[in-house]
Amino acid sequence: MLTRTLALVCAASLGAVSSPPAGAQPRTGQQVYESVCAACHAAGVANAPRFGDAKAWKPLIAEGQAALSRTAIRGIRAMPPKGGRPDLTELEVRRAVAYLANAGGARWAEPAK
């Protein structure tokens, strides 16, 4: 119950973050992480793998970039689809996944399209 409550609080707090203007360039993985993902991944809220924690990220990295990106887009356990930000493009989510995974030891290129 606590995990679900924390996830809902994180998702609700993300609604206050502004979206980029229409026609703007897609955000980088770092920009998405800092404005969306850090709310949970910086502190490990609801068992989210912490940013830079190589041990926690190792099995996720082993799943591969495409699989991990699909999971982030669809959501898993306490993490809602797109981290609770439906305004994010799939490209922006994939970029954030690469940024988080790279901080945990992956060597993935940031998706260009």
What kind of region is each of these model predictions?
Residues M1-T5:
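Positively charged n-region of N-terminal signal peptides that target proteins for export
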Residues A7-V17:
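Bacterial N-terminal signal peptides
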Residues G15-V32, V45-P59:
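Electrostatic cytochrome c docking/interface patches
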Residues E34-A43, A96:
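The canonical Cys-X-X-Cys-His
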Residues V36-A39, A56, A78:
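Residue-level recognition of specific faces of alpha-helices
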